[in-house]
């Protein structure tokens, strides 16, 4: 996993400079907790995730194949919890702290005082 994270962050920086085409990673966060390491990533599209995951020249595909070989020998050796959500519209409310999560990646829209509902804010994006 560390090799993939480094590869994606290097590509993100190179794409921001205009040196490479973006693989589609918008942002990522990793945290270590009692269950192990949790990594959350935000991508430009589901198609970008699948393109990266299946590209033989990128770090993910060889690592995934190695994981499957190891899991056949010892299914309890590594646990992967993978969820993909395609989000067309979303809302996150922050009262006080700086935006984080999806709002940090996609930007935040200030909540109006009156007459603006969550539905209106999502449609306006």
How would you label these PLM feature ranges?
Residues 2-38, 72-77, 82, 108-124:
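Short, glycine- and small/hydrophobic-rich beta-strand elements in well-ordered beta-sheets
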Residues 33, 46-79:
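An amphipathic, aromatic/His-enriched active-site/gating alpha helix that lines ligand/cofactor pockets
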Residues 37-38, 49-51, 91:
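Short catalytic/ligand-binding loop motif for oxyanion handling, primarily in non-cytosolic enzymes
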Residues 42-44:
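Tryptophan-centric aromatic hotspots in well-structured domains and transmembrane helices
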Residues 59-66, 84, 89-91, 96-125:
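Long, compositionally biased terminal regions
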